Regions:
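Short glycine/threonine-rich turn/loop motifs
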Residues: 19-132, 199-310
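Short, flexible active-site loop motifs that bind/organize anionic cofactors or intermediates
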Residues: 48, 144, 154, 172, ...
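Glycine/proline-centered hinge or cleavage motifs at structural transition points of membrane proteins
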Residues: 109-110, 116-160
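Short coil/turn segments at secondary-structure boundaries
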Residues: 120, 140-146, 166-172, 180-181, ...
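C-terminal capping alpha-helices of c-type cytochrome domains
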Residues: 151-170, 174-197, 297-311
């Protein structure tokens, strides 16, 4: 039983076997998280700023398996918090099989010049992206094709849940559930997922020049940073920063195909031009939050470096 306490209104809603309390008068601070001064890229649209209550609704939706056809898969099933909101599996498991591409990490999705989403950039915004997996036959099953119910069936399902009646009213002023409202809430939560506590951030804070050596880096780490940042050429670097732009390490919107042409299901996949941020590619022990690339074909960062060295 999950309990809701909101502005004097108490409601009990059965969502899981776990006991939890959500007090809408004491929300987690999503809107006012500290962002370093040197982070100046933000794809948040003016009509959907992050709010504490909006991101709270988005978080509940993100973790709710009832958003899938058979109530077995949530957004978090493929975008796992412990994997930088990505997946350790090459292909994620949906309601009707495995996905055709590796699940992209969501860390720092907000802090980027690129506004399009998915590996092939088919979604024009994060808002538009959030409900496409829900409407995918394999992923969450509200496709409206191949015998699946369509999204209106999910809207009806969510509308009947008392928890969502309370939350949608708190966010939007009425309990009406629509795709657009779900998109806005989910996008607010995803944009609230941020990471700026790395060794790089500590170095940049004391030496605010991405091309200078950082005093907290080892000699090898500073060499790696120079190789990453410097353009290719005699005595130059690898030019990684031309596409993965410091200090956010988001993908340049003008980046082309990266030369990885494989597909999880076999054959070629030539439409991929996007990348997640390179932040949180490993955990605090140095283990990769991988595998990497849209086809999950590279298990280690050394595999990635060797790929680019060969093309």
């Amino acid at each position: 039983m999950k309990k809701i306490i909101t502005l004097g209104l108490a409601a009990s809603v059965s969502l899981s076997a776990q006991e939890a309390i959500l007090d809408l008068t004491k929300l987690h601070s999503y809107a006012d998280q500290e962002v370093p001064d040197y982070i100046n890229r933000d794809n948040t649209p003016g009509n959907n700023p992050i709010t504490d209550i909006g991101a709270t609704l988005g978080r509940v939706l993100f973790y709710d398996k009832k958003l899938s056809k058979n109530s077995t898969v949530s957004c978090a099933s493929c975008h796992k918090q412990e994997e930088a909101f990505g997946d350790s599996a090459i292909a994620s498991v949906g309601v009707a099989g495995t996905t055709g591409r590796h699940s992209m990490r969501l860390i720092n999705a907000r802090f980027a010049n690129e506004r399009r989403f998915f590996w092939d950039e088919r979604a024009p915004s994060l808002e538009a992206q959030t409900t496409q997996p829900i409407q995918d036959h394999i992923e969450m099953g509200f496709s409206g094709a191949d015998g699946d119910p369509d999204l209106s069936a999910l809207v009806d399902r969510v509308s009947q849940i008392e928890l969502y009646q309370v939350l949608f009213t708190a966010v939007f002023g009425s309990e009406g559930v629509t795709e657009a409202r779900m998109q806005r809430a989910l996008a607010q939560f995803v944009r609230s997922i941020q990471s700026f506590d790395s060794k790089y951030d500590r170095g940049f804070a004391s030496t605010p020049n991405p091309n200078a050596d950082f005093s907290n880096f080892t000699a090898q780490e500073n060499l790696g940073k120079r190789i990453f940042t410097a353009p290719p050429g005699p005595g130059g670097g690898a030019g990684c920063a031309a596409c993965h732009q410091p200090p956010t390490f988001d993908i340049d919107p003008n980046s082309g195909h990266n030369g990885v042409t494989g597909s999880i299901g076999g054959g070629q996949d030539l439409t991929n031009r996007r990348s997640p941020s390179l932040r949180d590619v490993v955990d605090h022990n140095g283990s990769p939050h991988g595998p990497f690339m849209h086809d999950g074909s590279m298990a280690t960062l050394l595999d990635v470096v060797n790929h680019y060295n060969a093309i």
